[in-house]
Structure formats: structure tokens, C-alpha cells
């Protein structure tokens, strides 16, 4: 049987993470607590199925943890960090900021001085530093600065923004 003919049992991280963004947007627009409950009881527990604690720094993998190890993409994690920071800004609940900061540690691990800086696209394939990782990476750093007032995030956001402009 060809593997290409067998559909995956679960979604990849990238499409599943859109659920987090959507529920965040609904909660932000309505402030209806049912969306926060949906996030905490359904969306985030599902998201945790992708959280990889076997590799450090910890981060979200592209597929669930009960499957063989899968690639970890910096851009996918950046968007999750943005969502966690946004929901923290709305609720003030520390658990969301903690997760965003944990994700940022993974994002930092995807930077080096080759090409003058920037974030790679994929941890396992350090072949490209794309705008899809760097532009939202800058946004996440600035959002973390706003949430924490830690100037390190501001500097990192500025550096990524300037690198992306080159």
C-alpha cells in the first residue's frame, strides 16, 4: 500500500493552529467567555498533542507526538507564540505568557550569524531564512516586549525587522 493513499489520522500543526487563531479572534471581538472556555478545554489540549518535550528547546512539532518525530518549523511556532501573547494581553493569565516565552526560546535557537542574522524556516533543514519566519518573528518579539517590558525582546524584534528589510 502506498503511503500517499493513506490520509493522516490527525491534522498537521499548521492547519490545526488556525483553530487557536480563530478562537482568539472570536474571544477578542466578543469577550464572550465561552470562547475562552473553548480555548482552554478543547483547542489548547489538542495543541499540546504536538508539543515536543523530547528535544530541546521544547517546541511544537509539525505532527502529533505519538507519531515518529517530525520536523519543527520556526514559522509555525512563531504564529503560536503570537497567539499565546495575544491571549495573555487580553486575559492577563500568566500561563499564556509563559508558553509564549518558551516558544521564543525555540525561535532564538533558530538564529545564527550566517547571512548577518535571521531565523531559519525549519529546525531540521537549516537551508533558508525566509520572510515567513522573520517578519512574524519580529512581531512576536515586539509583542513580548509589550507584554513584559523586557528590552531584550525589543532589541531582538528590531534586529529581525532590520534583517528582514535587507
Feature map (PLM): residue ranges:
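Glycan-recognition and catalytic cores of secretory/periplasmic carbohydrate-active enzymes
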Residues: 1-166
